[in-house]
Each structure stands twice: as C-alpha cells, then as structure tokens.
Swiss-Prot record:
Substrate binds at R23, Q24, A25, G26, R27, D73, Y149, T204, H321. The lineage of its organism: Bacteria, Pseudomonadati, Pseudomonadota, Gammaproteobacteria, Thiotrichales. GO terms for cellular component: cytosol. Gene3D superfamilies: 3.20.20.210. It comes from the Bacteria. Its EC number is 4.1.1.37. This is Uroporphyrinogen decarboxylase.
Length: 344
C-alpha cells in the first residue's frame, strides 16, 4: 500500500505532500454519472457495495492520488435512526418529519438498532479497501451538522429552526447531539474495523455559529467522538469545519491529528494560528479549477512553495471543500500534475 497519506500524520517531515480531493468520486466524472443512472435514487446506490467501490476507484484510475474516501453520505446516521430521507432534484436531502420536540426525539431508534441498520456502509468500506492500494478514509458528519438537517428538514440559508432550538431549548439540542455523538463513535469504529485507515469528521455547518456556541454545540461533540475513538484505536482523525477559520485557536489543542482548512485563509495564516503538530489539509478554492491551465499551475505553485518552506509540519493537499459537479476533469489533472511537478 502507498502510505504517503498516512505518513503525513507522522513526526517526520515529508519530501512531498500527499493529495486527494473532497468528493473526488462524484458528478464531475462521466464514469460516475454512468453508474448513477443505474439506480433509482442516491441511497440505493450507497447501499450497493460494488457500486460504491466502483465509483471510489474512478478517480484513482484517472489521477495520481494518495488516498480514497468511502463513497457514502453524511446522512446515513439520521436515516438509520428512523428518519425518512429522500434526495430531491433541485432541493437536495429532505427529511419529511424533522425533529421539533422531545416527542420527535423519543421516536428515533435506539443506538443499537440504528447501528444495525448501517451494515451497508461497512460492506462498502470492506469492498473498497480490499480493491485499492492507497489508504481509505472513512467519514461522518459532525453531530451539529447532522442535527442541522434533522431539525430543518433540509438544507437552509439561515437555519432558523436549528438556531431557534439551540437558544430556546438547549437541553433538547444537547440531548440530540449527545445521542448522535454516541452513535457516531460506534459508526466510525465499525468503519475502521472494516478497513478504513483514517477518519474525517465533516462539520459542514459549524461555521454558522458564534464562537462560544461553536465550542459548546459543535466542537465539544467532535472532541468527545475523537477521544472515544482513539481510546479504542489510535488512527488519524481530521476535523473539518467549513467556514471555521475563526475557531482555529479552539481546535488546535483538541484530539484531532489534522485540521481541514478552507480558502478563506491562507495555509500560512492557518499554520500561524494552529501552531505546530497538526497536519493541515486544504485549501484550494474549488472554483480555481474553472481557471486556465496557467492560472491553475500558478495557484498550485504558490501553495506548494509555502508547504515546502515549512520544515516542521506536514500538509495534505486538497480543495477547501468538495469539488463542484461542473468542473472539467482535465483541470483536475492539471492541478495534480502541477502538485507533483512543483513538489519534486
């Protein structure tokens, strides 16, 4: 197995950084779209281990990447808890009966029953890990991010229902977050048991919170998960809060091994605020892949020059969020080739 990705979490400074891409198995690839049309809905595809493996392999077959990520979705846990999940074209994920009260929370399945409904994810991890020669990344959504969808019923610009519950009924909010955190610990451990070499916690909506609320309603539960996972098995864990650059000083002392960085700050700024000891992952703006070949190469060169100049810390080159569906696959090749060239 190529271990450059895992070596980034070690103490030795690497000669070159590993690279992978968030949502690297996705709609921008025509081969992904060819598999997707075979399934009536997205979750049916996620429940098919062979399909998950096939689409996870697509980017590895196209590009020189140092890691794969299991093909799944962050909302597998709420669905396993008994919530009715549908992916609606133009609207994204939708829960028909969102959480609004303690009564709604009481209707959810127990942790034991919920975990038993997630075997299809572990099967996808096992099938994929046995088919690749690079580390496989397992993942989950943060409790706060899962709660955001469970309470709103869908994505949102303002998340008014979510924030209302946080302020008006914090006890109910914490009850939901704690249950999600307890399930997530088992969920991640099962992914590792099935073959994941590291895990990532996607805190997609943590960035909407004020600092104190981020600490109490998001980071607290990610740290709880990381500590409990590491008590069982010491694997690399990466926290990624989208829009979370204001929170780096709070994250730097937590149990994660790496921190995802979006494009709102430079890697130099992020390193200054996080300090030494944590791997930084990121942080290209996904939209930079719309640019010309020359502009892509120039942007890559600037980031790689900083990475190479830091003699103490390792970095994982990635985008600052998931790749957009309409990106030209050839632009991705330009990016990766430039990363390899300028890292040589």
């Amino acid at each position: 197995m190529r271990k450059l990705f895992l070596d980034a979490f070690g103490e030795k400074k690497l000669d070159k950084p590993p690279v992978w891409i968030m949502r690297q198995a996705g709609r921008y690839l025509p081969e992904y779209r060819a598999v997707r049309v075979k399934f009536d809905n997205f979750m049916d595809m996620c429940r098919n281990a062979d399909a998950c493996c096939e689409v996870a392999l697509h980017p590895l077959q196209r590009y020189d990447l140092d890691a794969a990520i299991v093909f799944s979705d962050i909302l597998t846990i709420p669905e396993a808890m008994g919530m009715d999940l549908k992916f609606i074209k133009g609207a994204g994920p939708v829960f028909s009966e969102p959480i609004q009260s303690q009564k709604d929370l009481d209707k959810l399945k127990s942790i034991e029953d919920s975990i038993g409904s997630l075997d299809y994810v572990y099967n996808a991890v096992k099938t994929t890990s046995s088919a690749i020669n690079v580390p496989l990344i397992g993942f989950t959504g943060s409790p706060w991010t899962l709660a955001a969808y469970m309470i709103e019923g869908s994505g949102s610009k303002q998340f008014n229902k979510l924030r209302k519950m946080m302020y008006a009924n914090p006890q109910l909010m914490h009850s939901l977050l704690q249950r999600l955190a307890d399930i997530t610990i088992i969920y991640l451990l099962e992914q590792v048991k099935a073959g994941a070499s590291s895990v990532m916690i996607f805190d997609t909506w943590g960035g909407i919170l004020p600092l104190e609320h981020y600490k109490n309603f998001s980071l607290k539960y990610m740290e709880y998960i990381a500590k409990n996972v590491k008590q069982k098995i010491n694997i690399p864990i990466v926290f990624f809060t989208k829009g979370g650059s204001n929170f780096f000083e709070e994250i730097k002392d937590k149990s994660c091994d790496g921190v995802g960085v979006d494009w709102s700050v430079t890697l130099k700024q992020a390193r200054h605020r996080i300090g030494v000891g944590k791997v930084l992952q990121g942080n290209f703006d996904p939209a930079f892949l719309y640019g010309s070949k020359q502009s892509i190469r120039e942007t890559v060169r600037a980031n790689i020059e900083f990475i190479q100049s830091d003699k103490l810390n390792n970095y994982i080159v990635n985008l600052g969020h998931g790749i957009y569906p309409d990106i030209d696959p050839d632009s991705v090749r330009v990016m990766i080739d430039a990363i390899r060239e300028f890292s040589a």
